[in-house]
Amino acid sequence: DALPMCKGDSFPLDGVLHSVRPMCIGSMPVFVENQREYTIMDTSRFGRVTQVEVGALMVGKICNTPGQGRIRRGEEKGHFAFGGSTIILLLEPGRVQLNSEIFRRTARGQELPVRQGQQIGTAHDEEDMP
C-alpha cells in the first residue's frame, strides 16, 4: 500500500569522494565535501524529512530513482553504485524518538549499521508533540 508520503525531486551536490569511515570523519569534513544528493519528502507521520545520501571513496555514484509522487514502503528510492555508503536523515524537532542504541553508539564513536526496513525510531503521536 502507498504510505501517506510524497517524494520530491532529488538534488545533487557535487563534491569529492573521501572515505566515510569513522576514523576519517574526524580528520576531514566528509559530510560537506563529499558528493551528496538530497530529497525532501513530506509525510503525514514524520512531517518533512530530508534524506541526504553521501558518496564515498570506492562508492563513486549515487543513483536516485527519478520522479515525484507517492511512494510505497520498501520501494527503491535509489542506490549507491559499488556498495554502501552513508545516509543522513534530517527530521523535524520533536517528531521522532530515535532508538537509544543510536545515542549509545554515537557517544562511544562507533558506527551503527542499519539495514533496509530496520526501525531506527518511532513517530510521536500528534497529542505527544510539543
What do the PLM-derived regions correspond to, one by one?
Residues 1-130:
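Contiguous, well-folded functional domains in the mature portion of proteins
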